[in-house]
């Protein structure tokens, strides 16, 4: 393995304040009960900032501000004028992309090259894309006069904090809605910096409101009677609870939940290319990806070759400081998530699967887990059935295409899948039979703002991205 000199990105581009308030009606304000919590750097366990915790009264203030802005300013505003604000936000994101990328890596633990080269370009692209839709809604196929829903409550996860914010806020604003957004409690900082960007863009007060806190804050937001739309990305367990709480109300709901994607490698696949796709599919963002290719289904005749090449490639991965530009695998986002990964990995070994990790020195401080694969996995193993949400790959084999499809679909989830083969006809045959919302062919984890994203079964319902993403925020 090549030795690389450290290439750290400077923290000096980011000015992290000691404490942050709630962003309500265009201003940062203190919570009504004075509650707060700490946001920490998962790579070092260093406290980054003290974050205000919103209570039910604060959530009510935010929803009322959003309602006023919707009725008096944003809702009546012509689409071409809304577009100007979205274009302005997109340009500011581009101008401040280095600052945002560094802050994302500090707060989340992901490698800087991922936040810099993947997350931030996609964030800006989503705002640019939906800015272009804002004045074209009557011609988008939703009827001659589609109308916004009103106030959208949005709850986002910790794995792609700023990108999930863009997925939620950009289409909502383009459609004429106002927003109250709650970021995950472990990764609030880029959402709060986005609030500053809204101020910099002169976005009218109340159009975007950001309330920080844990589960109780999210529950108060989702259950608030002044909300017209709920959009949630996160675990299937929480998604079920939200669906129950919204049932019987007038609120529209979009859920993007867990996944246990199958990455299928046929015997005619280009092995080296497939191995790169396998590594990207499961170790990108430390496996903290809802659509991660966490189940590798490889045809028996090439299984040994694929595994040999995969282990050789895994030995080249560099784990360490997320701000080092050479780092491939950063820190696990929290102690709780690390415990979950360890629990399921230990269960895999206890149930008889063979565990392998490359030689890997883990830092003394922070939350770390070495990239890991399990072979000898059966469909009865917990590691083949449950979402681990970490850098852990379960390897299963198959003999025929029909068996591959049967095993791939044998999961309560249905978010994504990957197919690796040299035959276009086999790609089409397999994709047609996979019960997954997104199917990649000879690639993995490719995203674009023009493409809808979402799943089936326990992976949720509704689509985000593309023209489809607008429909979730319109009365059609």
Residue ranges and their predicted role:
Residues 1-51, 84, 88, 125, ...:
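Terminal low-complexity tails and localization/encapsulation signals of metabolic enzymes
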Residues 46-50, 203, 227, 264, ...:
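Conserved C-terminal structural/oligomerization subdomain of aldehyde/semialdehyde dehydrogenase
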């Amino acid at each position: 393995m090549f030795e690389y000199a450290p290439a750290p990105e400077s923290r000096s581009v980011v000015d992290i304040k000691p404490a942050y308030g709630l962003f309500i009606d265009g201003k940062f304000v203190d919570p009504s009960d004075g509650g707060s919590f700490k946001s920490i750097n998962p790579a070092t366990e260093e406290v980054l900032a003290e974050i205000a915790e919103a209570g039910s009264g604060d959530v009510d203030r935010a929803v009322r501000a959003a309602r006023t802005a919707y009725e008096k300013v944003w809702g009546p505003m012509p689409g071409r004028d809304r577009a100007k604000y979205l274009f302005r936000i997109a340009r500011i994101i581009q101008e401040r992309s280095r600052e945002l990328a560094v802050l994302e890596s500090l707060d989340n633990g992901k490698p800087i090259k991922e936040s810099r080269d993947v997350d931030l370009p996609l964030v800006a692209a989503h705002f640019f894309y939906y800015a272009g839709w804002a004045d074209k809604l009557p011609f988008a196929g939703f009827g001659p006069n589609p109308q916004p829903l009103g106030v959208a409550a949005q709850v986002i996860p910790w794995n792609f904090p700023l990108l999930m914010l863009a997925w939620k806020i950009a289409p909502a604003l383009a459609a004429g809605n106002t927003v109250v957004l709650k970021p995950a409690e472990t990764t609030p900082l880029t959402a709060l910096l986005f609030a500053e960007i809204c101020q910099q863009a002169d976005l009218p007060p109340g159009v975007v409101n950001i309330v920080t806190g844990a589960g109780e804050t999210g529950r108060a937001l989702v259950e608030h009677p002044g909300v017209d739309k709920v959009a949630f990305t996160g675990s299937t367990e929480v998604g079920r609870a939200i669906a129950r709480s919204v049932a019987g109300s007038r609120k529209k709901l979009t859920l993007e939940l867990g996944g246990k994607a199958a990455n299928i490698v046929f015997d005619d696949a280009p092995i080296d290319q497939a191995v790169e796709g396998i590594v990207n599919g499961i170790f990108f963002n430390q496996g903290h990806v809802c659509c991660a290719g966490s189940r590798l289904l490889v045809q028996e005749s090439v299984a040994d070759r694929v595994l040999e090449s995969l282990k050789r490639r895994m030995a080249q991965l560099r784990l360490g400081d997320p701000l080092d530009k050479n780092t491939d695998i950063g820190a696990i986002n929290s102690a709780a998530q690390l415990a979950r990964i360890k629990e399921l990995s230990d269960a895999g070994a206890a149930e008889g699967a063979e565990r392998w990790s490359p030689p890997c020195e883990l830092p003394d401080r922070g939350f770390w887990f070495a990239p890991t694969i399990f072979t000898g996995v059966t469909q009865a193993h917990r590691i083949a059935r449950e979402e681990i949400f970490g850098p852990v790959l379960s390897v299963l084999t198959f003999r025929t295409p029909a068996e591959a499809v049967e095993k791939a679909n044998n999961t309560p989830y249905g978010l994504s899948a990957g197919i690796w083969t040299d035959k276009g006809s086999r790609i089409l045959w397999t994709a047609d039979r996979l019960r997954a919302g997104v199917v990649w062919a000879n690639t993995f984890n490719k995203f674009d703002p023009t493409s809808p994203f979402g799943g089936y079964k326990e992976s949720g319902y509704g689509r985000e991205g593309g023209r489809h993403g607008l429909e979730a925020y319109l009365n059609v």
